[in-house]
């Protein structure tokens, strides 16, 4: 078997940047002839059973927390029917894989990826060139259609784990007095440049029109993979290990009412390098945001894959929580003003690793030319969402529902199911009970921005 070498590059944003940086060492380098990108994501809704889709495309949950962009970035549910769901906060299906192949030898030609039996998706996945699509909005970016209208209301930013609001908070952004560039920047906040492929007709993608098979609960990417196709080097075989495998679902539990200091706790997530929590709600025309970071930020740009270098830097700056962290308190009363019509929504990220595989490996001799035949990048993450406060306690019917909460409210991810001998509470589905009162950030942004 051809000898392969894992090249883990925490300081590089992508294989292309890594190769370019080697130029400073006077080594002649060329970009890989064939590049493969694999994004893997696990997503759940705390207290809800896992579902691949809901009737009618997911209804309210189909657009919940999907971001303000279009395309796959703007959909949080409804099935893994097209490329791009891994970067979004997809919860239906709960496990998503996006694959993009760029073959400079034969651009836009169909290919296939042989996969290990443990993926439980068949022997191989077809990689198909996409149809032309409008340019998608980047995470945190306010669409142009919303920027044409003068916004109203304010953004109130709170930050940090703790039972009480800290001195100097909240930071207030008055949208009615801000320039369009100011409020666009306010929504974007801290973010990283898009490091994904700019897919188009020259690429071949999965999922696609021919195949939308999703990863199952017991799927595993561990094992040998091989890309085949016209112009693809016969040597394009690589082995993925535990570090590149699907991350577990986040087992999140929340307690307390909006007028209280609400608690969040979770079990450690395997292969998680850092965590980040973000909650938001509405009070009149005001948008209230809180994050677990030690610095103020809207947090709209952090719900994406992060490079190892970015994770390390933001851990040092205390933007992200350390991987050994298992709990975080939300300050008392910051979401109390919304009342029954605005149940706060919490999002949580567990950032996994990023691996680069390049063949052949870089020569030890710095004077020798390096001409990689192919390169692979694999990124993994896990995320979950929860409705905060007692209004939604015990209202999740079906498998994995949380038991009735004691006074003060408690909310579990339901990953372990109801306790032995206790029936799951609630008789409603995903769109029953008070689900209609949950804050939908897409609609909330439309209201603030005058749409």
Which residue ranges define each predicted feature?
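Short, aromatic- and glycine-rich surface loops/edge beta-strands on solvent-exposed regions
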Residues: 201, 211-236, 340-355
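Conserved aromatic anchor
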Residues: 262-271
């Amino acid at each position: 078997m051809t000898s392969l070498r894992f090249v883990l590059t925490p300081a590089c944003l992508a294989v292309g940047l890594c190769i370019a940086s080697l130029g400073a060492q006077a080594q002649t380098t060329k970009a890989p002839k064939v590049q493969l990108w694999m994004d893997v994501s696990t997503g759940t809704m705390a207290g809800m059973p896992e579902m691949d889709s809901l009737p009618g495309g997911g209804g309210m949950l189909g657009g919940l927390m999907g971001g303000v962009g279009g395309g796959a970035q703007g959909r949080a549910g409804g099935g893994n029917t097209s490329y791009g769901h891994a970067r979004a906060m997809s919860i239906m299906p709960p496990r998503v894989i996006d694959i993009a192949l760029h073959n400079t030898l034969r651009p836009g030609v169909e290919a296939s990826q042989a996969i290990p039996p443990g993926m439980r998706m068949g022997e191989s996945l077809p990689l198909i060139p996409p149809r032309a699509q409008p340019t998608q909005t980047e995470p945190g970016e306010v669409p142009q259609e919303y920027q044409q209208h003068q916004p109203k209301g304010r953004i109130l930013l709170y930050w940090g784990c703790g039972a009480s609001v800290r001195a100097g908070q909240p930071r207030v952004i008055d949208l009615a007095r801000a320039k369009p560039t100011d409020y666009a920047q306010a929504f974007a906040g801290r973010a990283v440049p898009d490091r994904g492929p700019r897919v188009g007709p020259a690429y071949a993608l999965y999922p696609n029109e021919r195949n939308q098979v999703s990863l199952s609960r017991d799927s595993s990417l561990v094992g040998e993979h091989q890309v085949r196709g016209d112009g693809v080097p016969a040597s394009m075989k690589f082995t993925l290990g535990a570090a590149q495998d699907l991350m577990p679902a986040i087992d999140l539990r929340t307690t307390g009412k909006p007028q209280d200091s609400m608690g969040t706790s979770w079990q450690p997530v395997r292969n998680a390098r850092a965590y980040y929590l973000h909650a938001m709600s509405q009070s009149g025309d005001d948008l209230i945001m809180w994050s677990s970071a030690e610095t103020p930020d809207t947090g709209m740009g952090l719900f994406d894959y992060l490079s190892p270098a970015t994770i390390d830097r933001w851990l040092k700056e205390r933007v992200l929580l350390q991987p050994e962290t298992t709990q975080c308190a939300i300050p008392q009363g910051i979401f109390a003003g919304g009342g029954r019509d605005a149940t706060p929504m919490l999002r949580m990220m567990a950032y996994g690793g990023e691996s680069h595989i390049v063949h052949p490996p870089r020569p030890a001799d710095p004077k020798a030319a390096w001409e990689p035949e192919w390169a692979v990048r694999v990124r993994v993450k896990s995320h979950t969402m929860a409705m905060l406060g007692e209004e939604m306690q015990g209202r999740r019917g079906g498998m994995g529902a949380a038991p009735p909460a004691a006074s003060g409210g408690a909310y579990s991810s339901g990953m372990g199911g109801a306790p032995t001998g206790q029936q799951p509470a609630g008789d409603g589905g995903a769109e029953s009970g008070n689900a209609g009162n949950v804050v939908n950030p897409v609609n909330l942004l439309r209201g603030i921005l005058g749409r």
